[in-house]
């Protein structure tokens, strides 16, 4: 009995530590973000809620590969789905989540990307993020404020940025070898 109580106590303590670590990481990320901590929290909640609702549709989840990125209430959908009906179903689910201000549906109608393609996309995302570190001529620019996602060689850029920052980020992303095109999903600050 004593061992069971100790195990439960240890589990409770460890789960509390995990929450502190995760919460601390979110707080550090929010310190560099132009969004308020509350907005960062809301965006994460929108993503979790949308994924939960999408995962309830087994037909949809087994035949589609959907990635959702939410930034400042703007929901970006990328990935693949087999037909327009599924593309519309995904959009409807996400658009109905409380807090979504705008939906950008970039799902492509085709077979799911291969593991090789997904690996190339992840590599491109990393290369673009690393390339943004070279921006040092724009005052107070912080590359962590730019969300970079890639699907089938197309790079999607999100964030609250100035127009100068956006132009420079897009220019750098376009120069990364392997990038097919760049899509701006930015919101602008003055």
Language-model features and meaning:
Residues 2, 8, 18-190:
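N-terminal targeting leaders
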Residues 13-16:
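C-terminal motif of bacterial Sec signal peptides marking the signal peptidase cleavage site
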